Amino acid sequence: MLICLTASHHNASFEVLEKLSVAAPSVAGALMEQNDFIAGAVVLATCNRFEAYLDVEEPLTAARALAVEATVDVVSGASGIARDDVRGSVDVKCGDAVAEHLFAVSSGLESVVVGEGEIAGQVRRALEGARTGGTTSTGLERLFQTASNTSRGVKTRTGLQSAGRSMVRLALDLAESRIADWSATRVLLVGTGAYAGASLAALRDRGVVDVHVYSPSGRAQKFAGPHGIPAVEGRDLLRALAASDMVVTCSTAPTAVLAAHHMQGAAAVSGDGRRRLVIDLGLPRNVDPDVVTVDGVELLDLETISLHAPLRDLTATDDAREIVSTAAAEFRAASAEDEVAPAVVALRTHIFDVLEGELERVRKRGDSSDATEKALRHLVSVLVHQPSVRARELARQGEGARVVDAVQALFGLDVEMPAAVSSPVAVALSRTAEAGQAS
């Protein structure tokens, strides 16, 4: 069973999202380590959302409740947010709703800037991170890979992502009234992560030619070389700030990298009283809000930028949602087929075992021939093909349980299913009950 806990700009404040983003790197591993019944976990954290996707081994209401509470506990511990506040900041989606939600997210339909293209890469990197951490599962792999395919379908079949929508481009739109000549604007880019390339591209599209890059983690030179821009070392940060008209931050640093004292130092170095616009695209925030106490400094942060998100292109959005709904329906159908896979395997194994037994008896009598064996194997393959196909068709129609029952009843087979008594969920429930009695 798939479960998603989601907090976004729709239901949580940016203050909460900022704290959740700090917790994100440790959540999936902790969930897997502490809970046997969670088969996989992928955490997606962006500038406007935090989501934990879980693959729970048993489709039980108890499993859902335990998984949700376990996730709330881990997130609370990692973020420092009170447990009740975490629970109040997340929506829970279960089963079929998870696929449709992630497909919409990866297609940019749930973003602050609807149709923005960066989210698809963030979804892909979330899965890659889970692979690296060893927390993914077969179900989550298929879910996230299908989400990426769906996003590509939305991009190629609708005009939703054709306008280059993104948070950085929206921020530059808002900065337009403050910039007299983009080609003469000197920009300092702070951060070299996945969003830095998109930020640089957006600046260049505006006509900006003077961009320097600074990395709090010391990776400026590695980013600067391939992108053809100068790198700024830590000792030169104040001089770079002093020479800049605009600062764009998109670092993944867990704490603020710029504050009022940096801007005061820059003003002292430049001595020209110039105005500086700081655009903070980081979550957690890269820039301490106290920079606005420095004369001439204006700050655009994610919360402010989000307030100016454009209205949706209704036609393109409707087309995209239709693609998402179709993809989600197909994902549900394919997942339903998996439910009857043990029964189909058991049926095929039984029939081919019977065939092998008969062939062995024929060989012992000396009546066997290669042609006879080949013909019998072909006949059995033909006979089991239609029931196998029909089983998958019935599963897609929601009749998977009947297929399993029929195979067991007609052939006397014991289709292997998880043992509820010794299951991780049962054990967890037992522990919970014991803890309640002890208290």
Curated annotation (Swiss-Prot):
Q: Which residues bind substrate?
A: 46-49, 111, 116-118, 122
Amino acids binding NADP(+): 191-196
Q: Which UniProt keywords apply?
A: NADP, Oxidoreductase, Porphyrin biosynthesis
Q: Which reaction does it catalyse?
A: (S)-4-amino-5-oxopentanoate + tRNA(Glu) + NADP(+) = L-glutamyl-tRNA(Glu) + NADPH + H(+)
Q: Give the pathway.
A: Porphyrin-containing compound metabolism; protoporphyrin-IX biosynthesis; 5-aminolevulinate from L-glutamyl-tRNA(Glu): step 1/2
- UniProt family annotation: Belongs to the glutamyl-tRNA reductase family.
Entry's free-text remark on domains: Possesses an unusual extended V-shaped dimeric structure with each monomer consisting of three distinct domains arranged along a curved 'spinal' alpha-helix. The N-terminal catalytic domain specifically recognizes the glutamate moiety of the substrate. The second domain is the NADPH-binding domain, and the third C-terminal domain is responsible for dimerization.
**Protein name (database record):** Glutamyl-tRNA reductase
Q: Which organism is it from?
A: Clavibacter michiganensis subsp. michiganensis (strain NCPPB 382)
Taxonomic lineage of this organism? Bacteria, Bacillati, Actinomycetota, Actinomycetes, Micrococcales
Q: Tell me the gene name.
A: hemA
